[in-house]
């Protein structure tokens, strides 16, 4: 009896979990104002599990341009979080994620961890604040050090027709810095606007992306300024 109880608990947990995810292909892997695919297409996938109480965990992966730092052909990320329903319209989310560059050819790791808090209205508008305690700091294509970074951003989508949305987002990335000159604290803004169409689990996004030139001072990736990108995804 003492052995059977843990198995029963595990089985009960398994029946309570709900699973989901998506598979996507994008013409340009743009994230926070820079392109990690060097303007080329990327394949991406996500798989996650949710509990009835609001806890979720999952994994996400994307191909990327191997010639860019740190010499990895793809990104891999695991995450854990909890969603709090504040009312019928509002919810808050706390989450943590760990980002990896498997198979990187450079000798020094660019892996990092991130903590985030988000507030969402009707799953249509979200504002979030994130902290990266060990963010890697670059000066163009030269790796300098690690220093804490903060990110504030907002995203939204507005229904304008059956399955048709206007989309948009804006954010600001701030590196705390570790000294003077090229090591000084700095930051940059980024944003996007576009349209999206959803039907039967499929979604098509087309967006126009902007980013301040200061992004090139912090990341060894091409700037995604005045760029158009499209993504096709299937959600299950």
Stretch-by-stretch model annotation:
Residues 46-48, 79-81, 95, 116-118, ...:
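Outer-membrane beta-barrel architecture
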Residues 108-179, 208:
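Detector for outer-membrane/organellar transmembrane beta-barrel domains
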Residues 53-59, 88-94, 123-129, 158, ...:
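Repeated loop/turn-to-beta-strand initiation elements of outer-membrane beta-barrel proteins
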Residues 158, 193-202, 208, 222-236:
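Outer-membrane beta-barrel "beta-signal"
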Residues 10-67, 130:
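Short glycine/proline- and aromatic-enriched beta-strand/turn motifs that initiate or cap beta-hairpins
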Residues 31-38, 67-74, 104-111, 137-145, ...:
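Outer-membrane beta-barrel translocator domains and adjoining extracellular loop/strand segments
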Residues 25-31, 61-65, 84, 98-102, ...:
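Transmembrane beta-strands of outer-membrane beta-barrel pores
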Residues 15-17, 39-43, 72-76, 90, ...:
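Residues that define the transmembrane beta-barrel architecture of outer-membrane proteins
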């Amino acid at each position: 009896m003492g052995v059977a109880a843990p198995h029963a608990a595990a089985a009960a947990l398994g029946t309570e979990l709900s699973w989901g995810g998506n598979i996507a292909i994008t013409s340009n892997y743009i994230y926070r104002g820079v392109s990690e695919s060097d303007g080329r297409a990327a394949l991406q996938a996500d798989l996650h599990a949710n509990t009835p109480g609001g806890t979720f965990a999952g994994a996400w992966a994307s191909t990327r341009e191997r010639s860019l730092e740190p010499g990895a052909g793809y990104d891999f990320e695991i995450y854990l979080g909890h969603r709090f329903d504040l009312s019928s319209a509002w919810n808050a989310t706390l989450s943590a994620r760990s980002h990896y560059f498997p198979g990187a050819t450079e000798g020094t790791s660019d892996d990092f961890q991130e903590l985030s808090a988000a507030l969402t209205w009707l799953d249509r508008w979200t504002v979030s604040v994130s902290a990266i305690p060990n963010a890697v700091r670059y000066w163009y294509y030269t790796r300098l050090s690690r220093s804490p970074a903060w990110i504030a951003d907002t995203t939204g989508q507005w229904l304008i027709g059956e399955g048709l949305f206007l989309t948009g987002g804006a954010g600001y990335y701030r590196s705390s810095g570790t000294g003077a000159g090229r090591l000084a604290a700095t930051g940059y803004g980024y944003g996007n606007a576009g349209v999206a169409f959803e039907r039967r689990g499929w979604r098509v996004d087309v967006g126009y992306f902007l980013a301040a030139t200061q992004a090139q001072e912090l990341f060894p990736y091409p700037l995604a300024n005045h760029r158009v990108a499209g993504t096709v995804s299937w959600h299950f």
